């Protein structure tokens, strides 16, 4: 996983291409060293380098927000994990704090896989103790939190969703009941199949614009990093 140096500059991402999709399906169907080495130039030119360029464009949004890391994954699996397949089937970009385990903390992300792309905000598995802290924070100023939710959903045009407790926690007011039911997998995510809109620099503009609208939500949950 490569870190992105945050330097101010021009837009670097020029877009993916149909060959990107061909490689992603190819590695899914032929996940072995011989096939990968034969197609390594395709990986570098059509998948890794464009993803790294998009990561650098995203990093520019965080130049004035110290403490955020922008990471770009690589295709090679960690051999220490003893996975039966040597290569991943997707690449992703992740914006997060310098934390021990990403899944317990909020992040902004972009992912490209054989079926398409996804990007947005995700908070996969917050600790129960952290969710309790979040509920207390919400209760301190419900109007401020509800405004954050409304503003985010209005700006993005998408709902903020979450995995719910089977038995929701008791909320101090009716307006907070939906949020006291949150257990994890809190997200606001765009899913797109590959199309002409994927191939070109406009994708980078679209991704950066969407992630920028999610920064206030991301900042709120970053108060509870572990």
Task: Enumerate the predicted regions with their spans.
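Soluble extramembrane domains of integral membrane proteins
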Residues: 68-73, 80, 84-97, 148-165
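Long, solvent-exposed, polar/charged low-complexity segments
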Residues: 2-26, 30, 50-51, 139, ...
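Active-site acidic/histidine clusters and adjacent loop/turn architecture
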Residues: 20-21, 25-65, 69-75
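Inter-helical turn/loop segments and adjacent helix faces that build the functional surface
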Residues: 30-38, 128-132, 201
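Compact, glycine/acidic-enriched structural inserts
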Residues: 114-172
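Surface-exposed helix-capping loop/turn segments at secondary-structure junctions
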Residues: 57-67, 153, 220-226
């Amino acid at each position: 996983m490569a870190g992105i140096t945050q330097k101010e500059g021009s837009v670097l991402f020029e877009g993916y291409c149909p060959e990107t999709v061909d490689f992603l399906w190819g590695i899914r169907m032929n996940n072995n060293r011989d096939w990968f080495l034969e197609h390594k130039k395709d990986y570098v030119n059509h998948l890794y380098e464009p993803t790294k360029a998009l990561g650098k464009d995203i990093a520019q949004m965080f130049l004035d927000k110290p403490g955020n890391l922008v990471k770009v994954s690589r295709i090679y699996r960690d051999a220490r994990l003893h996975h039966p397949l040597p290569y991943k089937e997707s690449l992703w970009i992740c914006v997060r704090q310098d934390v021990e385990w990403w899944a317990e903390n909020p992040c902004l992300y972009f992912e490209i896989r054989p079926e398409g792309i996804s990007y947005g905000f995700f908070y996969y598995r917050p600790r129960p103790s952290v969710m309790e802290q979040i509920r207390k924070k919400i209760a301190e100023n419900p109007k401020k939190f509800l405004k954050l939710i409304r503003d985010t959903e209005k700006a993005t045009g998408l709902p903020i969703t979450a995995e719910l407790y089977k038995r929701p926690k008791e909320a101090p007011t009716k307006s907070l009941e939906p949020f006291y039911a949150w257990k994890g997998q809190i997200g606001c995510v765009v899913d797109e199949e590959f199309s002409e809109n994927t191939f070109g620099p406009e994708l980078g503009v679209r991704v950066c614009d969407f992630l920028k609208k999610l920064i206030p939500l991301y900042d709120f949950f970053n108060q509870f990093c572990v």
